[in-house]
Curated annotation (Swiss-Prot):
PANTHER family: ACETYL-COENZYME A CARBOXYLASE CARBOXYL TRANSFERASE SUBUNIT BETA, CHLOROPLASTIC
Lineage: Bacteria, Bacillati, Cyanobacteriota, Cyanophyceae, Synechococcales
NCBIfam families the record matches: accD
GO cellular component, one term: acetyl-CoA carboxylase complex
Pfam families (UniProt xref): Carboxyl_trans, Zn_ribbon_ACC
The gene coding this protein: accD
Entry note: cofactor: Binds 1 zinc ion per subunit.
Keyword ATP-binding: yes
Catalytically driven reaction(s): N(6)-carboxybiotinyl-L-lysyl-[protein] + acetyl-CoA = N(6)-biotinyl-L-lysyl-[protein] + malonyl-CoA
UniProt entry keywords in alphabetical sequence: ATP-binding, Cytoplasm, Fatty acid biosynthesis, Fatty acid metabolism, Lipid biosynthesis, Lipid metabolism, Metal-binding, Nucleotide-binding, Transferase, Zinc, Zinc-finger
The name this protein goes by in its record: Acetyl-coenzyme A carboxylase carboxyl transferase subunit beta
Described function: Component of the acetyl coenzyme A carboxylase (ACC) complex. Biotin carboxylase (BC) catalyzes the carboxylation of biotin on its carrier protein (BCCP) and then the CO(2) group is transferred by the transcarboxylase to acetyl-CoA to form malonyl-CoA.
Necessary cofactors: Zn(2+)
Sites where the protein binds Zn(2+): 33, 36, 52, 55
């Protein structure tokens, strides 16, 4: 077999006669924890909410897995699924934005980087938005902003509590100001939700950064976070260069932010649904049938 044929077979996914290493995440039978190196069956890892049984490391999960962990089985009703991003600036860096969108849509099965809808948690009705980091790093463009805004408005109209699961690199630069204005738009909708005396809880997962942190991620009545999640605005290196000093090793972690009053509580993923149910009951939320508006 020539070298050219070997690479051609590799591209087709055919065997080359060599033993190749299984991916560490998801596609093979086994998964290796990047923190402690523990190797476990993927099935066992998924059965533990994708949390390492050895060290508690929270592996990244997609929006569908997240919804399954939060919502009562069969209770999630998606909203505004038809909204699809455009390319208003005909933006191109190393690649065209339109190509990046098509690639992300094909890889994730999503139209954009957030899934929104209504659900029940232990029988209690709640509005839920889940950002998906697989879609262009969870970046917030006009569709992400519009879907979250519509969900907040729906929650306000129905007098429902709201949970937004944040996982984002920030505003989507390929949409320019159309992306940045989503920060103010969502914040305005959340203020009306607050004025209606309704509960809003953001859940900060790894990573939550940039314009998402600078807007709706930090506007909650109760700010929740997953253990060791990276949470910040600018990158660590940028801050160190600006301040000209070394930052603590745990800087921009969920634990650091909790110690400094920016996060109210850290909730392990395996305890999330029960913790949410307790918080909803504590704030007087009630069972409710979810019907189409």
């Amino acid at each position: 077999m020539s070298l050219f044929d070997w690479f051609a077979d590799r591209r087709k996914g055919q065997s080359t006669g060599k033993i190749t290493q299984e991916p560490e995440e998801g596609d093979g039978l086994w998964s290796k924890c990047p923190e402690c190196g523990l190797v476990v069956y993927v099935k066992d890892l998924k059965g533990n909410a994708s949390v390492c049984a050895g060290c508690g490391h929270h592996h990244r999960i997609d929006s569908h897995e997240r919804i399954a962990l939060i919502a009562d089985p069969g209770s999630f009703e998606a909203l505004n699924e038809a909204l699809e991003p455009t390319d208003p600036l005909t933006f191109k860096d190393r690649r065209a934005y339109a190509d990046r969108l098509r690639e992300s849509q094909a890889a994730t099965g999503l139209r954009d980087g957030v899934v929104t809808g209504l659900c029940r948690v232990d029988g209690l009705a709640m509005a839920l938005a889940v950002m998906d980091f697989r879609f262009m790093g969870g970046s917030m463009g006009s569709v992400v902003g519009e879907k979250i805004t519509r969900l907040v408005e729906e929650a306000t109209a129905r007098r429902l509590p709201l949970l937004i699961v944040c996982a984002s690199g920030g505003a989507r630069m390929q949409e320019g100001m159309l992306s940045l204005m989503q920060m103010a738009k969502i914040s305005g909708a959340l203020e009306r939700h607050r004025e209606a005396e309704l509960l809003y809880m953001p859940l900060l997962t790894h990573p939550t950064t940039g314009g998402v942190t600078a807007s709706f991620a930090m506007l909650g009545d109760l700010i929740l976070a997953e253990p060791k999640a990276l949470i910040g605005f600018a990158g660590r290196r940028v801050i160190e260069q600006t301040l000209r000093e070394k930052l603590p090793d745990n800087f921009q972690t969920a634990e650091y932010l909790q110690d400094h009053g920016f996060v109210d509580t850290i909730v392990p993923r395996t305890q999330l649904r029960s913790s949410l149910a307790s918080l909803l009951r504590l704030h007087g939320c009630r069972p409710m049938e979810i019907t189409s508006a």
